Amino acid sequence: GKCYWLKVYEIPEGTKNSKGRAIQNLLNIDSDDAVNAYLRVKSLSDQEYINSHYVLFCTKNGVIKKTLLEQYSRPRQNGVNAITIREDDRVIEVRMTNGNNEIIIANRNGRAIRFHEAAVRVMGRTATGVRGITLDNDGQDEVVGMICIKDLETESVMVVSEQGYGKRSEIEDYRKTNRGGKGVKTMNITEKTGKLVTIKSVTDENDLMIINKSGITIRLKVADVRIMGRATQGVRLINLEKRNDQIGSVCKVTTESLEDEVPTEEVE
């Protein structure tokens, strides 16, 4: 639940195959701690900017918190407390908003809730937050991601499961409710699909990078993934050739930023 600062030019540039450096070499964090989320911020000295944007936190157990960006505008080497985390919880997503975004939170069991960020009051840095989504009481459910929708006309919802299945759905398929509910089905979770691993807001101009736990990476065009109903199973996005392999990470990138970097794979 702590926040640290780092200038992008201080990060050593590497290739796509390089190992990278331990984050402890760049930030003054404990050796047993880990980075769970990061934000790219345009400026921390522009008063108008930092007083008109918010940092939105979401935790594994469904807690959400909104704090004015200004609260994080004074860098300290040892970091500052960004959110008070309850026992057995952790931050899984952090987004920056302008105060007028639609929020969608998804859980591992394939449900998602949509509400306006105005439903989350502004709190101080050390606050715990409020209930964003109610999880299933099965001991295994948890939040897998949170997205902030800025443009309802061009953005859609992309979800990906453990076994490499995924799909896009229209935002309007998710009815707007009050925060704290259980939400609606965002993917039909089966033994074949595995549990949900991520949710992303995407446009036709985006590419998707999918990395499985065995280290294989593919890139695919979001426009090649057809729009489907939110309660459907989706289509296979990546073939997992090794037994017990699963999707490890998914990220959204602009198409032009990856030209000639990673081979594109067709979607079944």
In which residue ranges do the predicted regions lie?
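C-terminal interaction appendages of subunits in large macromolecular complexes
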Residues: 2-268
